[in-house]
Amino acid sequence: MAEVAHHNIPAVDMINATSRLQLEAAEVRSNKPNWGSYFRSKMIQEDDYTLVTSYENAKSKDERDQVIAANDANGQLAKTMANLITQVAKDQNVRYVLTLFDDMLQEDKSRVEIFHKAAHRQKRTAFSQYLGILQRQDNFIVNQMSSIIAKLACFGVTRMEGQDLQYYFSFLKEQLKNSTTNEYMNTTARCLQMMLRHDEYRHEFVVTDGVQTLVTALNGKTNFQLQYQLIFSVWCLTFNADIAKKTPSLGVITALGDILSESTKEKVIRIILASFVNILNKVEEREIKREAALQMVQCKTLKTLELMDAKKYDDPDLEDDVKFLTEELTLSVHDLSSYDEYYSEVRSGRLTWSPVHKSEKFWRENAAKFNDKQYEVVKILIKLLESSSDPLILCVASHDIGEYVRHYPRGKTVVEQQQGKAAVMRLLTAEDPNVRYHALLAVQKLMVHNWEYLGKQLDSDAQGDGVAAK
């Protein structure tokens, strides 16, 4: 059986927290369609009419089970639901059928297999006939359908695969990207929570840039309930060791660390700490584990843990997580070199004027290390020059490219081969004066041969321009 995320953190039940979809569904249930009129007008078939009215009139789960059993063997239940969803014209009535369908699966998870078996008999998947509904214009219909698809994918033993899975994850990611306009974001997050509890779905989500989409959503303005749901999805992903070791390079730790340093909601704090514990436990490669720990330290996680340790929680899991992380992160700090610190900062993409950037000793001792892993650090710095809009990051990256060139004899050649010279020169026309200043210094270092002369010239330029190096 596939690994499913387990911990004493509430599972996907917390999803039943009131959402826009659930509020609207309550109203939809009270507006039953006039199926008799549809039948008399020959807009639905007699089999569909008989089944849906019998199911509506059933007063208990036992009675509903009897209706389902009577229509299971011949596949009529699955056929009727598909017919009513795809053939009924009015959105209001499609809303009703989808809500009925969702309630049916929520009441008894095993019912999903009825739909999978019926689809199998038709040599198709249960998902394929419903994925097209996600393109409808009515947002309630789209999100209720999405919720049903997630249940079909998670409640039984049949899993979504191939193009169906790619299409569905692509849909969910688009919904996440529209976080400012998507009024059903809690439903989108709920579907992700359900899907990512199953290891079979995690890899596909990651290879289609799902993690980056999650991180972007987390970095946006979200209420704490949605924040919790999105972090829950991240937590689920960290149960997979291959995914856990990618988290330092995908901005996951930094995003969670920023939220941790500001959040006052205990359940948000707990899920972040549980995610950090997973990452450190799952990653076996010493270097990656060390980098992950260092990113946590840079996000002031130790300070948060210190404050939490002063409180007393009636939760042994939380206490264990606080103790484990405190020990691991403290050890990582003690075993830290200046290059480790610098490397982690560069990999995180969040450059600041930390002491190492201005340390002559650091550059003398470590410039050659920029060539490790096929010039990884140089490539990251150049990528930041090309893609970042943050003046501070652009200043520091320009400065570091210049220092690398100054301290490594072949640095100019390496930077030019990686298109770094062009990236720096483009910043000579940047709006921010400090960016222009540091770009100019870097360009001069890329072109000059006499370093003693350059040092005097830079001092003179700085005094003349009156620009402070920030």
Curated annotation (Swiss-Prot):
Keywords: Hydrogen ion transport, Ion transport, Transport. It comes from the Eukaryota. Pfam families: V-ATPase_H_C, V-ATPase_H_N. GO terms for cellular component: vacuolar proton-transporting V-type ATPase, V1 domain. InterPro entries: ARM-like, ARM-type_fold, ATPase_V1-cplx_hsu, ATPase_V1-cplx_hsu_C, ATPase_V1-cplx_hsu_C_sf. GO terms for molecular function: proton-transporting ATPase activity, rotational mechanism. Subunit of the V1 complex of vacuolar(H+)-ATPase (V-ATPase), a multisubunit enzyme composed of a peripheral complex (V1) that hydrolyzes ATP and a membrane integral complex (V0) that translocates protons. V-ATPase is responsible for acidifying and maintaining the pH of intracellular compartments and in some cell types, is targeted to the plasma membrane, where it is responsible for acidifying the extracellular environment. Subunit H is essential for V-ATPase activity, but not for the assembly of the complex. PANTHER family: V-TYPE PROTON ATPASE SUBUNIT H. V-ATPase is a heteromultimeric enzyme made up of two complexes: the ATP-hydrolytic V1 complex and the proton translocation V0 complex. The V1 complex consists of three catalytic AB heterodimers that form a heterohexamer, three peripheral stalks each consisting of EG heterodimers, one central rotor including subunits D and F, and the regulatory subunits C and H. The proton translocation complex V0 consists of the proton transport subunit a, a ring of proteolipid subunits c9c'', rotary subunit d, subunits e and f, and the accessory subunits vah-19/Ac45 and vah-20/PRR. Belongs to the V-ATPase H subunit family. This is Probable V-type proton ATPase subunit H 2. It comes from Caenorhabditis briggsae. The gene is vha-15.
